[in-house]
Amino acid sequence: GKCGDINAPCKAECDCCGYTTCDCYWGN
């Protein structure tokens, strides 16, 4: 998925956006 796509795998989202935890988009 693209950056910000909540359906993308958590790690992929965080890596995409340059964060180190999955809290980058949603707080779990």
Curated annotation (Swiss-Prot):
Keywords: Disulfide bond, Ion channel impairing toxin, Ionotropic glutamate receptor inhibitor, Neurotoxin, Postsynaptic neurotoxin, Secreted, Toxin, Voltage-gated sodium channel impairing toxin. It is found in: Secreted. Expressed by the venom gland. Its main location: secreted. One of its GO terms (cellular component) is extracellular region. One of its GO terms (molecular function) is sodium channel regulator activity. The keyword Transcription does not apply. Disulfide bonds join 3-17, 10-22. The keyword Secreted applies. Insecticidal neurotoxin that reversibly inhibits the N-methyl-D-aspartate (NMDA)-subtype of ionotropic glutamate receptor (GRIN) and inhibits inactivation of insect sodium channels (Nav). In vivo, is highly toxic to insects. Belongs to the neurotoxin 03 (Tx2) family. 05 subfamily. This is U15-ctenitoxin-Co1a. It comes from Ctenus ornatus (Brazilian spider).
